[in-house]
Amino acid sequence: MSVVNSILDQIQLPRMVRVRQKFDETMLDDIPGEVVRQLSRTEIASQIRPGMTIAVGVGSRGIHQIDVIVRAALNYLKACGAEPFIVPAMGSHGGATAEGQREVLANYGITEVSMEVPIKSSMEVVPVGVNEDGFTVYIDKNAYEADGIIVINRFKPHPAFRGRYECGLMKMLTIGLGKQQGAQVCHTEGFPKMARNVEMFARCIIKNTNLIAGLGIIENAYDRTMELHGLTSEEILDQEPALLLKAKKNIPTVIPTRLDVLVVDQMGKNFGGDGMDANVTRRFLVPGMEPDPEGPACVVPLSLSAESHGNAMGIGAADTTTRRLFEAMDFEATYPNALTAALAGSVRIPMVLDSDKHAIQAAVRSVWGADPARLRIVRIPNTLHIEQIEVSEALLPELRDRDDIEILSEPYAWDFDASGNLF
């Protein structure tokens, strides 16, 4: 790409400054103890009987200390005399294969050895009913055949739709336990109707299965557990909307807005369903989601996390990227996710450049009317961990006097290696 590289080498990048963004730091000190306190509520504990088999649904998200949370729940159930086992509840993730979903759990330290319970991973589903709109509703066969079901998930705004129930326990029932087939049916009408479908499908599951409870997690902006909520099936229906609103107030944001370029060191399924959380990037993939006027002109992901196992869902939100990321993509892992979600645009390939430097320079070149002396650039590690970020020198005047920003360094040049990469 000698011609391309010669064009890009002329583009100057501004000096950067490291800053700390300050958010609410409230967090739980005793996570295992709180898990037990929530599950031992009379409304939940009264449903757990000695000898009953309980399927515990665990998803694919990079939830902080999810292994600790799951282990505490399993230990409590065993102490009650129940016989719990784990079911991967992650729709079509893990390449839509049983072994792939088992591997996703293993990435989070969740294995049969570490949890001391069986993991029943299968893509086989059974119909549990027909919802109000006439759609057949499916859930994991192993979960359906258990004496009871408990699901564990984080409350969070969804990057592709808005509604009373977004990412949380209702969606875990519908999409997670629905596996590939159930998730595909729920996505049939696309994201404009997803809010209604998640609710209608989940209500059908609650009505026709032995759902004991859900364990809902609210994280602070630093990816730490802020609250845990053990909810019965009826409480999920009634209380999840308010808990979602609380979660929305605590999601991290990139404080500088109207950027020319947002550089994301790493994208991946462990950071969000679309690889880069649109609630952070302000770059939405779904038709019908209004473009955010505060969003960046260009988005540049530099690499794909190992935890994604090649699933680059969300790469379609990028304007440029690196050959390193492109070569890490596994289309067999990526395309089932996009097809299940009926979002072909989410996996469109952006311009691929040889190095981090050239990918960033290509993005700068693509910004219409950008002032080279006042380029607004932010670099973040990923969309889940954005406490410490880098900002271009031109952003300092508007950030320097803010109470929620701490300047950590003097301006410095980008630290590219001999190959033009940052890491």
Language-model features and meaning:
Residues 135-225, 230-235:
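Divalent-metal (Mg2+/Mn2+/Ca2+)-assisted nucleotide/phosphate chemistry catalytic cores
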Residues 39-55, 78-79, 256:
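Glycine-rich phosphate/diphosphate-binding loops that line cofactor/substrate pockets in enzymes
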Residues 226-279:
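A conserved active-site cap/scaffold subdomain adjacent to cofactor or substrate pockets
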Residues 1-33:
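N-terminal amphipathic/basic leader segments beginning at the initiator methionine
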Residues 64-83:
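Histidine-anchored nucleotide/phosphate-binding helix
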Residues 53-62, 85-90, 378:
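Short glycine-rich or small-residue beta-strand-to-loop segments that form or flank ligand, phosphate
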Residues 282, 288-423:
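C-terminal non-catalytic interaction/assembly regions of soluble proteins
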Residues 100-164:
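An acidic, phosphate/nucleotide-engaging active-site surface
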